[in-house]
């Protein structure tokens, strides 16, 4: 039976970069747990802002946090008051100096994490799961996605037995490394229990960065 590889982890170093960009030998475990705490705090504090991903860069006792959000206005607040409050709270979680940067997500409809969270929110509001899934598929294709797959698992519609349902439109080639596939996961906390929502979105094809930098191979022949 075939198993699913995480689409983003599978493409790291080929067409995708890491969300944590730093190198450390002695304090690796400390920094890793610190990154987890920073991400969890931002997600909890800015739950309504539509957070797609959080990038963390470290260099010379400085931590730069890039928050990719669909609603930058909620993060920044009136005259930048919101961002200063969050920055102050984040400073208490780390010994290093914190720099907070807000990056706007232009097309939230083709961002897998935001689509998954949107479906989860609709399920919590008791909207029919088939309707929520089909609407997300149609919207993503309308905004330029080449293909999309949406899957929900759990006690769908309040049924006694948990099941797995999915819809797919267009191309979603999970084994093609040059395929720019975005993946997102969210959980809907309903009265019947948790429902998992997974989304795969194919946004096009990207040539691997290493392919362009690689020197052309020469065949053996007479010496010049």
UniProtKB/Swiss-Prot annotation:
PROSITE patterns, A to Z: KH_TYPE_2, RIBOSOMAL_S3
Membrane spanning stretches: none
Domain KH type-2: 38-106
InterPro entries: KH_dom, KH_dom-like_a/b, KH_dom_type_2, KH_sf_prok-type, Ribosomal_S3_C_sf, Ribosomal_uS3_bac-typ, Ribosomal_uS3_C, Ribosomal_uS3_CS
UniProt key word Nuclease: no
GO MF annotations, alphabetized: mRNA binding; rRNA binding; structural constituent of ribosome
Keywords: Ribonucleoprotein, Ribosomal protein, RNA-binding, rRNA-binding
SMART domains listed in its UniProt record: KH
GO aspect biological process, one term: translation
A GO-annotated cellular component: cytosolic small ribosomal subunit
Family: Belongs to the universal ribosomal protein uS3 family.
NCBIfam families on file: rpsC_bact (TIGR01009)
Subunit (UniProt): Part of the 30S ribosomal subunit. Forms a tight complex with proteins S10 and S14.
Function, as annotated: Binds the lower part of the 30S subunit head. Binds mRNA in the 70S ribosome, positioning it for translation.
Protein name according to UniProt: Small ribosomal subunit protein uS3
Source organism per UniProt: Anaeromyxobacter dehalogenans (strain 2CP-C)
Source species taxonomy: Bacteria, Pseudomonadati, Myxococcota, Myxococcia, Myxococcales
């Amino acid at each position: 039976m075939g198993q699913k590889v995480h689409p983003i982890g599978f493409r790291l170093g080929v067409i995708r970069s890491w969300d944590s960009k730093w190198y450390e030998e002695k304090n690796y475990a400390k920094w890793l747990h610190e990154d987890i705490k920073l991400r969890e705090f931002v997600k909890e504090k800015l739950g309504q802002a539509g957070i797609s991903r959080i990038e963390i860069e470290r260099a010379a006792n400085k931590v730069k946090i890039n928050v990719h959000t669909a609603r930058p206005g909620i993060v920044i607040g009136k005259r930048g008051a919101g961002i200063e409050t969050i920055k102050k709270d984040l400073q208490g979680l780390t010994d290093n100096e914190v720099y907070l940067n807000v990056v706007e997500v232009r097309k939230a409809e083709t961002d897998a994490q935001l689509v998954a969270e949107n479906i989860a929110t609709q399920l919590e509001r008791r909207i029919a799961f088939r309707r929520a899934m089909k609407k997300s598929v149609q919207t993503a294709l309308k905004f330029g996605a080449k293909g999309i797959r949406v899957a929900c698992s759990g006690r769908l519609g309040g049924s006694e037995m948990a099941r797995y349902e999915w819809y797919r439109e267009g191309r979603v080639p999970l084994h093609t490394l040059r395929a720019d596939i975005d993946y997102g996961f969210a959980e809907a906390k309903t009265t019947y229990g948790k429902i998992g929502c997974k989304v795969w979105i194919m946004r096009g094809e990207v040539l691997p960065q290493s392919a362009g930098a690689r020197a052309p191979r020469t065949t053996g022949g007479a010496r010049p």
